[in-house]
């Protein structure tokens, strides 16, 4: 949820959003074998306790990473779902968001659990997403590193 960031800052932001009345908060978690797989059910419990939705995302093989070897950390959505089902009952839902997430509901709660599976269940034909990186680059495809530098556009055309 923060990668290598400040988890306390993350908590403050999430609780501030809840406090001011955001009614639909969704947590996005990239899961990695050997890093955070043991936290999956704790994160679902946190989402349930706060009536948040949560989506688990398979890591996309984009960019360089020095923090881990992707071949050793790849963890598929079916494995995450299996871990969750050991502790919670999940049911299929017909809800669609026009996005890549496939949702299930935790029985007896308001929480939806989504699975975004670019590796194990390619969704390119259904994707309607673009991304903005932390350094202001617009990614027209989440699976491609070609991008547009939004920061320079905004700085060079501040009134537009």
List PLM regions with ranges:
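Radical SAM/AdoMet-radical enzyme domain recognition
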Residues: 1-57
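Short, charge-patterned binding micro-sites
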Residues: 60
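Accessory C-terminal segments flanking Radical SAM cores
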Residues: 63-160
């Amino acid at each position: 949820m923060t990668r290598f960031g400040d988890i306390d800052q993350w908590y403050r932001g999430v609780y501030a959003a809840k406090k001011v009345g955001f009614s639909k908060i969704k947590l996005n978690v990239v899961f990695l074998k050997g890093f955070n797989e043991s936290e999956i059910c704790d994160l679902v419990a946190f989402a349930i306790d706060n009536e948040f939705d949560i989506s688990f995302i398979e890591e996309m093989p984009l960019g360089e990473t020095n923090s881990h070897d992707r071949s050793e950390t790849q963890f598929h959505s079916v494995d995450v779902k299996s871990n969750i089902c050991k502790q919670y009952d999940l049911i299929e839902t017909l809800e669609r968001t026009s996005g890549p997430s496939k949702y299930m509901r935790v029985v007896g709660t308001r929480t939806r659990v989504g699975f975004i599976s670019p590796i194990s269940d390619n969704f390119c034909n259904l994707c309607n997403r673009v991304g903005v990186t932390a350094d202001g680059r617009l990614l027209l495809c989440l699976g491609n590193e070609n991008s547009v530098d939004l920061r320079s556009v905004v700085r060079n055309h501040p009134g537009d």
